[in-house]
């Protein structure tokens, strides 16, 4: 049995936020990449460079300005998160120190000991995992 060809490829993951430039600077520093000026349309959309470039199949991370942005609430369902990023690190303690120094806040709820939950500058939850 052969697998049919994909109907599409994952190209960009875009996060809504109040200030795309702030979010792009934060995640560029966390991920060790840069803003992709050619793909960043204006102040309303800022995109990071893709690992390996578009031809290399890399997925881009972008930030889109939304008026009256409300950060997701986790845990809870008042304004639930619909997506979160898991970012791999070699060492949780060192990773925590690095993301906090860059502007992340450690979430009060930590449901496990193999990963850590943080909030980015716009309040989106993300996790650091060893991997």
Segments (PLM) and residue ranges:
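A short, acidic/glycine-rich surface segment
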Residues: 68-74
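Short beta->alpha transition motifs characteristic of CBS
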Residues: 110, 128-131
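Catalytic beta/alpha-barrel core
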Residues: 86-88
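Generic beta-structure capping elements
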Residues: 51, 64-68, 131
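Short, acidic, Ser/Thr-enriched surface-loop or helix-capping motifs
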Residues: 120
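Short, solvent-exposed beta-strand edge segments and adjacent coil->beta transition regions
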Residues: 8-12, 80-84
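Core segments of cupin and vicinal oxygen chelate
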Residues: 2-8, 14-61, 94-97, 101-108, ...
